[in-house]
Amino acid sequence: MTRVKRGYVARKRRKNILTLTSGFQGTHSKLFRTANQQGMRALASSHRDRGKRKRNLRRLWITRVNAAARDNGISYNKLIEYLYKKKILLNRKILAQIAILDKFCFSTIIKNIITE
């Protein structure tokens, strides 16, 4: 069987890892073994935090809608209940944007929901 030389493949693999970790501090961007560990850790953290970001944004939207709803004399819980009863399809992100950017429109929505 002929000999297979793997110098190029190994060098390319290490170069890819070191390129991934090029912005890291100290030996985490210079030495392959520590760079490899930190690269895997960074990818795991970014994967975990993408899910965490979604949860945090939903909490922020709910907080904003709750504050705006209480300014109009209704709790967040009742507002969502009335929206479901009237079959109005506004999600929390859109409600939060309306509450911040157009307070008059938000109060109009609440008045229409409550009165009917």
From Swiss-Prot:
Function recorded in the entry: Binds directly to 23S ribosomal RNA and is necessary for the in vitro assembly process of the 50S ribosomal subunit. It is not involved in the protein synthesizing functions of that subunit.
Family stated for the protein in its record: Belongs to the bacterial ribosomal protein bL20 family.
Subcellular location: Plastid, Chloroplast
Keyword line: Chloroplast, Plastid, Ribonucleoprotein, Ribosomal protein, RNA-binding, rRNA-binding
Organism placement in taxonomy: Eukaryota, Viridiplantae, Streptophyta, Embryophyta, Marchantiophyta
A Pfam family reported for this protein in Swiss-Prot or TrEMBL: Ribosomal_L20
CDD domains: Ribosomal_L20
Taxonomic source organism: Marchantia polymorpha (Common liverwort)
Protein name as annotated: Large ribosomal subunit protein bL20c
